[in-house]
Amino acid sequence: MASGSYWCYSCSRFVWVSDSISCPDCDGGFLELIQEPLDFTPSDSFTTTTTTQHRSPTRFPPPSSSSSTPSASMHADNSPTPTIVTRTRSNRSPNPVIVLRGSAAAPSSDVVSEGLDRSAFQMYYDDGTDSGLRPLPPSMTEFLLGSGFDRLLDQISQIELNTNRNLRSCEHPPASKSAIEALPLIEIDPTHLLSDSQSHCAVCKENFVLKSSAREMPCNHIYHPDCILPWLAIRNSCPVCRHELPAEDLTDGTGAALTAVTATAEEEEDSAAGLTIWRLPGGGFAVGRIPGGWRGGDRMMPVVYTEVDGGRLGDERLPRRVAWGSRRGGRDGGGSRERGGGFAGRIMRLFGCFSGSSGSIAAAAAASSGSGSRIRVTRRTRSFSMFSTASSSSRRRNWLA
């Protein structure tokens, strides 16, 4: 093996490796074999300077290309010494990685590992040259899927599956409009204020004001009108005792029932579009959600801003946007990108789990082919991040989107 023939993306320099193919300095496996390595002997000063100034990964294209290969300058004794490449926005390693759902085609045996269908995901990166999103090379995709990404994506899929089950188990439809309008509007009197159960609104927990207005449920529980009406718009039960009002008539006029969870084709395109996954400097991953509203014919997709990407949380700058490159998919590891309904329909079934239980995302649930039913649900959109590796417990944190 030629000395110094491997480039470490973590240390941003050429290194000698053992048979285990790992960097002897950072013990990382993010290495690339350079076919024509520079023949030099690194000095102690070079090692120290490089290690301290280039801890952050280097972005594609790899160092073997002319744009990012560390050039050699000649000393008086004609011995080549490396020229340190300044870390810029255009030469960092692919971070974040854009993850989209892959093709629904049956996977081949060589893309399935440890129970995860690797063809179920498409991975892209922005090379920082305004050329748009590019599919990750096959070798890099295989590396990421073998370094914790597979467990991370598998865990995300399990969360999505559990969330969909919870949506399907929701048995409380909205209250009917006539039942809501029939709720009496009463005036708060001293007897209400003396009662433990009627002195305050059970939704906002605030005490009623004498001679103010309140809505009274058939179960005699009373609420502020501004509190109970939004509640009854999403479920027909009393927040305290679960007494149920008549439910909304979920029919479309032709006898075909509408389930409590559906979306039209336009709402599907407004749902979650995908994920942005960052590798954190201290290890592990951070996951951000690409906001909805993306259309199949659009050339642009929004990308979340974080400290890892050079911005500060709370910064007033607009989120950075990246465009799809002219090269799409193929055999470069990302799969083909279709325009129009095919690709849009595929990405609309992406990670609907990235929202809290109190929240509202236009869930992209496919309509049942035989029943003619349509599903409709809204929950508040919220981003979600995983700071530990997929094998550790995840923690929540909002990312700017």
UniProtKB/Swiss-Prot annotation:
<dbReference type="InterPro" id="IPR039525">
    <property type="entry name" value="RNF126-like_zinc-ribbon"/>
</dbReference>
<dbReference type="InterPro" id="IPR010543">
    <property type="entry name" value="DUF1117"/>
</dbReference>
<comment type="function">
    <text>Probable E3 ubiquitin-protein ligase that may possess E3 ubiquitin ligase activity in vitro.</text>
</comment>
<keyword id="KW-0862">Zinc</keyword>
<dbReference type="Pfam" id="PF06547">
    <property type="entry name" value="DUF1117"/>
</dbReference>
<feature type="compositionally biased region" description="Polar residues">
    <location>
        <begin position="76"/>
        <end position="93"/>
    </location>
</feature>
<keyword id="KW-0833">Ubl conjugation pathway</keyword>
<dbReference type="Pfam" id="PF14369">
    <property type="entry name" value="Zn_ribbon_19"/>
</dbReference>
<feature type="region of interest" description="Disordered">
    <location>
        <begin position="41"/>
        <end position="93"/>
    </location>
</feature>
<feature type="zinc finger region" description="RING-type; atypical">
    <location>
        <begin position="201"/>
        <end position="242"/>
    </location>
</feature>
<protein>
    <recommendedName>
        <fullName>Probable E3 ubiquitin-protein ligase RHC2A</fullName>
        <ecNumber>2.3.2.27</ecNumber>
    </recommendedName>
</protein>
<dbReference type="InterPro" id="IPR001841">
    <property type="entry name" value="Znf_RING"/>
</dbReference>
<keyword id="KW-0479">Metal-binding</keyword>
<dbReference type="GO" id="GO:0016567">
    <property type="term" value="P:protein ubiquitination"/>
</dbReference>
<dbReference type="GO" id="GO:0008270">
    <property type="term" value="F:zinc ion binding"/>
</dbReference>
<dbReference type="GO" id="GO:0061630">
    <property type="term" value="F:ubiquitin protein ligase activity"/>
</dbReference>
<comment type="pathway">
    <text>Protein modification; protein ubiquitination.</text>
</comment>
<keyword id="KW-0863">Zinc-finger</keyword>
<dbReference type="InterPro" id="IPR013083">
    <property type="entry name" value="Znf_RING/FYVE/PHD"/>
</dbReference>
<keyword id="KW-0808">Transferase</keyword>
<dbReference type="Pfam" id="PF13639">
    <property type="entry name" value="zf-RING_2"/>
</dbReference>
